[in-house]
A protein has these predicted regions:
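Active-site proximal loop and beta-alpha junction motif in alpha/beta enzyme cores
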Residues: 1-141
Length: 142
């Protein structure tokens, strides 16, 4: 997806359509001073069934899945958007050690196919800050 956003500089459009493994997606680019500042995409309906995510959990939807990394406990909500995601709330994303915890949590036994780990900070009712540890890739700007 990131490569498509970079192409904007050549085509000067605010909407870009791309084909992904999860289907065709439309990206809406927020442009400021001729640079892509943010990208918005409708990823469709999330998959919430544990066996389809996949995640090992008796609870559906999977909320408050408690996992531990380096003696720190996390509570995750898990979804699939074509691949497994586990989201947890942290106090401050800027100071949070994403690499330290992401690489451990990605391969937790609760995730048979590994998982993308999102560390989210709630700013207000409409905004969050998030950092992403992508399975097999490390921290990304996704």
């Amino acid at each position: 997806m990131c490569r498509k956003v970079c192409i904007w500089q050549r085509i000067y459009k605010t909407t870009v359509t791309i084909e992904t493994l999860a289907g065709i997606k439309t990206l809406k680019l927020n442009i400021k001073d001729k640079k892509v500042e943010t990208v918005r995409v409708d990823m469709g309906e999330p998959i919430l069934e544990a066996d389809k995510i996949p995640v090992i959990s008796k609870e559906e939807p999977v909320k408050n899945l408690e996992l531990e990394a380096e003696n720190r406990k996390f509570k995750f909500t898990c979804v699939s958007m074509g691949n497994p995601h586990a989201i947890t709330i942290v106090e401050n994303t800027k100071e949070f050690e994403v690499e330290r915890y992401g690489k451990i949590l990605e391969v937790d036994k609760a995730f048979p196919k590994k998982a993308n780990i999102e560390f989210a900070q709630v700013i207000d009712k409409e905004n969050i800050k998030m950092r992403v540890w992508e399975r097999g890739a490390g921290e990304t700007l996704a």
